Swiss-Prot record:
Site (Involved in the stabilization of negative charge on the oxyanion by the formation of the oxyanion hole): T146, G147
Claim: Nucleotide-binding is one of the keywords in the record: no
Keyword Amino-acid biosynthesis carried by entry: yes
Protein name (database record): Arginine biosynthesis bifunctional protein ArgJ, mitochondrial
Additional information: This protein may be expected to contain an N-terminal transit peptide but none has been predicted.
SUPFAM superfamilies, sorted: DmpA/ArgJ-like
Cell compartments where the protein resides: Mitochondrion matrix
Site feature location: Cleavage: A238, T239
Length: 471
């Protein structure tokens, strides 16, 4: 056991022992090269954004398909949107949802960097555009950045890095095998402890398609992203970045609809610390390399619905990796709210529970303090069903709270119909000592609304990481 941390409050001195962060090594494993979608080349290199030599900090992703490549995105709603967010949103609006390339740097967020930041983001776009085999629009590259806010990019190093991937360059490393995908995923990382990369194969109407994607994030995680091409007026709360690629052909409008649905049930349903980044972005490219038959929500509704569900499941798998890699996290907790008047209400309550500092510290302490869960639940105002009726009120005599182990053993009710149970504290401790478990809140049949959120605990290691972030 590590040396105790001495916490002094008033006249008392309380020794508190920190716990080791569980290993994440099992979450990073090789994937067969055949599992990746057709028609993409990519790489990750060290351009010099990060201080440590040899650490990847620049990713380049290109679609080489002869078919048009649809693109969709969801961006942060933060008022201080970073330059790459603004630039990429503009490109997607101008192109009507088409793009063939993505360029990503880590180590510098290029956020709150004024005119120079915008010029640097456009420079990254232009240089990557030059690598594309063909173009229909003036600009067909989307850009992402992550790192420290308020610092300018070393743009000359980034430009040199992008140019190193030209066909005529002896240092070109763009490829389509697992190593190339892994290099790109590593270039996304900041405080992440492992590259987050997954793939998925699925079949629609007898045609086999593939999804593959990478994301990054471990801190400054509480996304609230909206669709590309809109002016965001809502302002809410290390950055969440993600890029998903598929060889299906999907119309731009339908791709955006599917992504918006998927993000709400995946990346917008995770929280590490409750802080929304200036750079949060999720991109999807669909290049039609597997089949030229276009999936469209109006023309082929059944195929579209199948694709939407595949994308949602895949996005959730990627999103969960971010929570599992939460800075200093020792727990992965699923928060489920059911019996709410609507999905929106269930999602709002699950979000409040997942971001409560009191709940998250109780998770770290392995303390079944269900009162904190209940307090968070009751603090959320429910939405009125229409403008002429008052919002519904939770019937506290029907609410149930249950701690559900992930190992398949019996759940532990702690509150039943508003009445506290005589909780077996040893059993509660046994469940909460596990790395994975679920908190289930049932509002007692107010409606069919049900939502899940994924969160982690707050540890001393989280404070250490973020106290030292810029040093």
């Amino acid at each position: 056991m590590s040396a105790p941390f001495i916490f002094k409050r008033f006249s008392s001195t309380i020794p508190i022992h920190s716990k080791p962060t569980p290993s994440k090594a099992h979450l990073h494993f090789p994937l067969p090269s055949s599992s990746f979608p057709k028609g993409y080349v990519l790489t990750g290199i060290h351009a010099g954004v990060k201080k440590v030599a040899g650490v990847p900090d620049l990713a380049v992703i290109l679609s080489t398909s002869s078919q048009p490549t649809s693109a969709a995105a969801c961006f942060t709603r933060n008022a201080f949107k970073a330059a790459p967010v603004i630039v990429s949103n503009e490109i997607l609006k101008k192109n009507g949802g088409y793009a063939r390339g993505v360029v990503v740097n880590s180590g510098c967020a290029n956020a709150v960097t004024g005119k120079q930041g915008m010029e640097d983001a456009w420079a990254m776009v232009r240089e990557t555009d030059a690598l594309l085999p063909s173009k229909k629009f003036e600009h067909e590259t989307l850009v992402m950045s992550t790192g420290v806010i308020g610092q300018n990019l070393p743009i000359s190093k980034i430009v040199e890095g992008i140019r190193s991937q030209a066909e005529s360059s002896s240092t070109r490393s763009l490829a389509s095998d697992f190593s190339a995908w892994e290099r790109a995923a590593k270039a996304f990382m900041t405080t992440d402890t492992f590259p987050k990369l997954r793939s998925r194969t699925f079949t629609i109407d007898g045609v086999e398609y593939k999804l593959a994607g990478m994301d990054k994030g471990a801190g400054m995680i509480h996304p609230d992203m909206g669709p590309a091409g809109t002016e965001f007026k809502k302002q809410l709360h290390a950055t969440l970045l993600g890029c998903i690629l598929t060889d299906a052909a999907v119309s731009p409008r339908s791709l955006q609809s599917a992504l918006t649905y998927a993000v709400d049930r995946s990346f917008n349903s995770i929280s590490v610390d409750g802080d929304m980044s200036t750079n949060d972005s999720i991109y999807v490219l669909a290049n039609g390399a597997a089949s030229s038959s276009i999936i469209d929500e109006d023309a082929t509704p059944q195929a579209y619905e199948a694709f939407k569900q595949e994308l949602t499941t895949f996005a959730a798998d990627l999103a969960k990796l971010v929570v599992r890699d939460g800075e200093g996290a020792t727990k992965f907790v699923t928060v489920t709210v059911k019996g709410a008047p609507s999905y929106k209400d269930a999602h709002s309550i699950a979000s409040r529970i997942s971001t409560s500092a009191l709940v998250k510290t109780a998770l770290y302490g392995e303390d079944a303090n269900w009162g904190r869960i209940l307090a968070a639940t009751g603090s959320v105002p429910l939405s009125p069903t229409n403008a002429n009726t008052p919002p519904p009120v939770i019937d506290t005599t029907k609410v149930c709270v249950t701690i559900v182990p992930a190992d398949g053993t019996a759940p532990l009710p702690v509150l039943v119909n508003g009445e506290p149970e005589n909780v077996d504290e040893d059993r509660a401790k046994e469940i909460m000592t596990q790395e994975d478990f679920e908190l289930l809140v049932d509002l007692g049949g107010m409606g069919d609304g049900e939502a899940q959120y994924w969160t982690c605990d707050f540890s001393y290691e989280y404070v250490r990481i973020n106290g030292d972030y810029r040093s």
